[in-house]
Amino acid sequence: MAALVPDETTDDADTAVAAAVDMLAQAGVKAHGEVRNTIFGYAAREIINDAGEVGAGVIVMGSRGRGDLAGLLLGSTAHKVIHLSHRPVLIVR
């Protein structure tokens, strides 16, 4: 499986993650945010593997992706991460 991610999407993601990390720091929460592009592989498995590599205490991700039918209430990638991960998963809108 392969996906192409437009540069604008990556830039927007970097900006959003930096803002979230700043807000958490202001609240006294130690956080690390990182945007990674998965070109080959399955997104859910890559997210779980990346979380393991960095020793994440929790995986935070959006509730919906770009697919309209894949997940009516919860995006299919988020759904898979919730069910496959042994780490806590926080879903945000």
For each of these PLM feature ranges, what is it?
Residues 58-80:
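Glycine-rich, Arg-bearing micro-motifs that act as flexible, cationic patches
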Residues 84-93:
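Intrinsically disordered or low-complexity boundary/linker segments at protein termini
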Residues 1-18, 46:
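Acidic, proline/glycine-rich short linear motifs
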Residues 22-59:
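Structural beta-alpha unit
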Residues 5-7, 50-52, 77-78:
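Short, hinge-like loop/turn segments at secondary-structure boundaries
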